[in-house]
């Protein structure tokens, strides 16, 4: 789990939640006013885990702020449960904080209404019925929401709920985890937000297949140090290679990444292999200034190391539907196989944050963002 999310998982006081938000943004007078308001509006309400309810919207706003610093989007995250869980109305929200915020809060309230009407909550429901209901919910959700900012706040809301899922009964944990995989993960994927997608997948995986999760987690913990040492050596060699061939030290970044648990599990299931046979448990990621630099770096790497041609993929020339662009290559060095991902810094922002990396606004209005085109 991402260290940032691990820290948020431990926060259980209003003061602690506000401190986390302050680490991400300078809290404006408008947002301070909204924080004071939601603390009062949700007074006397507590989550199943015992903390004051307003801790939740503040932490949802904290997660949201990593994708957008837009004041109205963060305000929406803070207010996302007000209409549903307190006596205050959308008209009140619009009068106090404007139509842009009230429209987004309305979208989030609509999501809650759709879920309430369509999703099965009985603990006796079969897995098949739960999945079918979740698929229906996803279709209706996508059809009814035309602002991607609403979906991103909802994804952040779901992530915080997943972080605190342990306090619920086991049958509810599994139902919510399955709903997360069927409804929210595909939306995060189509919006290109790998940061949210990967966290949601692993949290859901933990509750749906705990034994399989533990096996993968134990293997990674047992082997991570040795594998990391091997990759550190390879990173140093690759960095030296690129710097010798014209790349400046301060214009490139090279680091390793570990494949997340659910992705490992899917590859094992799809290919019928053991975890030891998954070639890309670890990979190195090379960030360079421009598209052409990606190909320059690739050329130098293929001249230095023998490539495994069958595993080469050029997602720059042919991007994924969600906008993902990266060159994937696999090479041999010292009788070991190393996966390498090469992308520009801009491509990395899109890969991590998806549509949120290139939101464009003019006078508070969205420019050319259509959820139906992206997801439908």
Question: Model-derived features: where do they sit?
Answer:
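Active-site helical microenvironments for divalent-metal-assisted chemistry
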Residues: 1-338, 343-376
